[in-house]
Design a protein with these regions (language model features):
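Beta-propeller fold detector
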Residues: 13-19, 69-75, 119-124, 159-164, ...
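Residue position within the beta-strands of beta-propeller blades
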Residues: 1, 42-45, 95-97, 140-142, ...
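Structural motif
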Residues: 2-3, 49-60, 102-110, 145-150, ...
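Short loop/turn segments that connect beta-strands within beta-propeller blades
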Residues: 6-10, 62-66, 112-116, 152-156, ...
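Repeated scaffold domains used in trafficking and secretory/extracellular systems
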Residues: 23-37, 77-90, 125-136, 164-175, ...
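Hydrophilic extracytoplasmic domains
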Residues: 143, 149-211
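N-terminal "mature head" segments of proteins
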Residues: 1-27, 31-34, 204, 209
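Solenoidal tandem-repeat scaffolds enriched in leucines and small polar residues
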Residues: 34-37, 43-108
Length: 211
């Protein structure tokens, strides 16, 4: 149940009941990921993987008055699992992996939250890539083992702006800065904190050893 309350904990009001996923044997599947954005709750639900034709359900729930709409039904392939991480919302779009089974690479989608349709799909997305940020229809992200990248939606061109051969990078973009926390391997032996300006000039670096 989606509930609204005052900041002091009073005034609980039920807005909507979250959609349930029903298995063929009658069992109900609950839970998923929740993202609040611009007056909506975006809900990526756990699919009922026991059903032979399951796919990831994505819902948009209006906080006023609680109307629920399922998104991307025509675009998400069958047997698409729930993405455990890598989901982000930016500039009216949701970016999310579409994992199939246990593949190391999978499709990664850009979905328009207004139209409810997927507009862009990267077919070779590595699960260690970072989340995506959209500024003025240019996508910013880190590709594992490649570096910091920009994808211009107008031209369909990806550019590696800062080559960086690291196993993983958690990236945060602001208006003026880029902050990274990189890891050297799956064992996480060394963590490096980095700060750049938006022209990719290094401003600071701190190396942390695993304790």
């Amino acid at each position: 149940v989606l509930v609204r309350m005052n900041m002091d904990g009073t005034g609980h009001t039920e807005i909507a009941r979250l959609p349930e996923q029903n298995a063929l044997d009658g069992r109900k599947q609950l839970g998923g990921s929740y993202f609040f954005d611009n007056g909506y709750l975006i809900f990526l639900a756990f699919p009922c993987t026991s059903n032979p034709d399951y796919a990831l359900p994505v819902y948009k729930i209006q906080l006023e008055p609680g109307e629920t709409t399922q998104l991307f039904q025509e675009d998400i392939p069958l047997l698409t699992d729930w993405p455990a991480d890598g989901v982000s919302i930016s500039n009216g779009y949701i970016y999310f992996p579409m994992p199939q089974a246990k593949a190391s690479e999978y499709a990664f989608a850009e979905g328009n939250l207004e139209t409810g349709r997927i507009e862009l799909v990267f077919e070779d997305w590595n699960k260690m890539n970072s989340a995506v940020v959209n500024f003025d229809n240019v996508l910013y992200y880190h590709r594992a083992g490649i570096g910091l990248c920009e994808y211009d939606k107008a031209t369909g061109t990806e550019t590696v702006k800062l080559p960086m051969d690291v196993y993983y990078a958690n990236v945060s973009y602001t208006k003026d800065y880029i902050f990274l926390r990189t890891l050297d391997s799956a064992d996480f032996n060394q963590c490096v904190l980095l700060a750049y300006d938006r022209d990719y000039n290094l401003l600071g670096k701190l190396e942390l050893e695993k304790i």
